[in-house]
Amino acid sequence: NDLGVVVLGRAASEGVDWEKGDKCDPSEGITNPMQITLKEKAMIKLAKEKCKKVIVIINAVNQMEIQELADDPNIGAILWMGIGANYAPKAVVDIISGATNPSGHLSDIYATSSLSAPAMINYGDYSYTNKDQVIARSKGTGQKYVIEAENIYTGYRYYETRYADYVNNLGNARSNAGSSYTDGNWEYSKEVTYGFGYGLSYTTFSQEIV
């Protein structure tokens, strides 16, 4: 009972996109699939009751909403393992046992709310009004489309760029547009759980530029 390991996961692959409210069981207390379900919360609670230390492993390529885990003082560590095929479990065991030191950094951002990004707001199930004609063409396109109004500002690019604009008071970066909260203006610290490039390790050495 010294250590409890809880694994949270979400399935994903090319061409399999999560939509707002997709595959959500109302009885699980979630409104979008990136949130932690009641069953998962119960599993984490049990681990904390039975074990001295608890580590939560995120086995997903999607960025889940894990602010409550980051705020929980009874969770010793959160480890992202992605979907690493056959060798990933061995690497996780080596990290947990102390055989190797975790030193990776996030390649994308963990937002407090996965629905706050413009790319998510713009996404949807849209079909051309003349889709029957499109399908009839021998070399036609598909019947679905998405207007990517967010341009390059997907993932961390949106949050990091808006933060820079917020600091420099540019545009409407300080407005409540796109905010996950209704108690004030948009704030990076409230919108982001773990920023781009975030990553901790257990090394004891330090480096100094002289």
What do the predicted segments below correspond to?
Residues N1-V210:
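C-terminal non-catalytic regions of proteins with extracellular/luminal or membrane-system context
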